[in-house]
Amino acid sequence: MESGGPTYRIENIVATVNLGVELDLEKLAERLAMAEYNPDQFPGLILRLTKPRISALIFRTGKMVCTGAKNEEDLKNAVRALVKLLRDHGAEVPFDPEVQVQNIVASGNLHAEVDLEQAVLMLENAMYEPEQFPGLIYRMSSPRVVMLIFGSGKIVCTGAKSERDVATAVQKLYNQLKDLGVLYIEEGGGEEEEELEEL
């Protein structure tokens, strides 16, 4: 990859976990000091882990939603920690429940300005209405993600199901925009900008 190519960072992974058993949330709430449970306001029990920093919404049906992971490894570790916590406090949940990533959100930078007016004319499944939203919305078919592209070169990727999908989508987008001639890469512009900030 040439210098000034795209970069990205995963902001959030949302996954569902099927524990396969019904849970007594009242009993768990009594036993787990860090649990938040107010069934009048929300039907699920909320647990927040600090390492990795993840929130889990646990429902009576045995379904669990995990949010906040920054990578798939953190997600796996969090699910293991949650399963251990639930088992240690009387819930007979399986050691290795079914985990399914529902959505990965990543932010990124193409390190080049984008001519959105031209890009929307050349990309299939793209929409750009600057009066309503400053970014171009591009529905990529493979991998199946939605990219928000801003004139500054900043991007947001949503809908990915794996970290590999994010990496593939970001690089593919960069290559497409470059091939279409709508990316404006300033050679050496970054160094000049840094020097100006220091003054």
Curated annotation (Swiss-Prot):
Biological process, per Gene Ontology: DNA-templated transcription initiation
Repeat (Sequence) residue spans along the chain: 10-86, 101-177
Entries under InterPro entries matching the protein: TBP, TBP_archaea, TBP_CS, TBP_dom_sf
UniProt KW rRNA-binding keyword: no
Stretches that traverse the bilayer: none
GO function terms (MF aspect): DNA binding; DNA-binding transcription factor activity
Pfam families linked: TBP (PF00352)
Keyword Aminoacyl-tRNA synthetase (UniProt): no
Keywords assigned: DNA-binding, Repeat, Transcription, Transcription regulation
Its biological purpose: General factor that plays a role in the activation of archaeal genes transcribed by RNA polymerase. Binds specifically to the TATA box promoter element which lies close to the position of transcription initiation.
Family: Belongs to the TBP family.
Family annotation (HAMAP family): TATA_bind_prot_arch
Protein's recorded name: TATA-box-binding protein
Native organism: Pyrobaculum islandicum (strain DSM 4184 / JCM 9189 / GEO3)
